[in-house]
Amino acid sequence: MVIQMKFFNREKEIHEILSILEGEPNIIYFIYGPLNSGKTALIKHIIENKLSDDYKVFYINFRTYLISEKREFIEAIFTTKKDDFFEKIKDKSEVLNLITKGAKILTGIPIPEVEFDKLFEEKINDAFQYLNSILLEVKKSGKQPVLILDELQMIKDVVLNWQKYLLKELFQFLVSLTKEQHLCHVFCLSSDSLFIEYVYSAGELEGRAKYLLVDDFDKETALKFMDFLAKEILNKKLSDEDKELIYNYVGGKPVYIYSVIDEMRYRKLEDILNLMLKEETQKLKYFLKELDYIKPKVELKDEIIEIKKDDIINALKLFKENYEVSDDDIPEPVYIYLVKKNILFLNPIEGILKPQSFLIWNAIKKLLNGH
């Protein structure tokens, strides 16, 4: 029997997102958080289990695409297939049938093949206008359209003709859907905190966007999650000591807690946790050792800035005593590099930096103990 990870809790976030969906669309929502904190799991749980058939969801996941040009973006958001059997969409009437009577959740914007081929030759706004017409038809049928763009940062650097950035054009379109037409709810998900910082700081969406943090579980929720998983997977209760030990090693990251308890079916808890920490410490050690031979650089406002190993060490040393520090405490180029390397997570709305996980935090403390 394959034991799958179950969705747990998130009542606060579920209530907030459902309340948004019950209202009129007027703002773009960015859902962000550390790696593997459960952003996609949360939004999928809501659209699959909490929404009535009065909603039509278009879920586009850029995670599986390498997008470097307009063509690849169009291929990612549109589909010419009717269903899982790869039957092609022939005409507009079949599109209307799919968006008004078909499944509640579509993983692409349906388009007849002949129309799809034309999009490659036309301006990006023509693709957006087609999408707009589809959403209007959904609304006309009595359903509320919802557009979800997962891992949106994948298109950040795509440049169109005349040196226009695709992301800028997309944002203008999303503002039209929400603030101007009040046509469609829009949620953009990202695990790239530098991308969220870019969107938040750029000012293009000032007053047009809000940001929802999906963080790792707090301690109370993490311990309840352990109880839930222990009953589901191990068919037994964990001692308070075991739960404290798990939390001290991996914190509230759902995927790590699940992994630990799943492995407890056939391995000792101490062995599982020690190996996880050892692997994370080794990764960090090799990362720091590499800095003896390379000169990392980051781009900041069109300037290329070189990062020194000592600056990296000094930044990480701040976490020996604290899990969170202000982003003012670490030079911007240094934290940009550490965030890019998935060692730190930046919350730009709060101005806070912290390790991407408790595991990384423990590795930092273990490795820099003598510094």
Curated annotation (Swiss-Prot):
InterPro entries: Archaeal_ATPase_domain, ATPase_dom, MJ1010-like_2nd, P-loop_NTPase, WH-like_DNA-bd_sf. Keywords: ATP-binding, Nucleotide-binding. Belongs to the archaeal ATPase family. GO terms for molecular function: ATP binding. It comes from the Archaea. This is Uncharacterized ATP-binding protein MJ0147. ATP binds at residues 33-40.
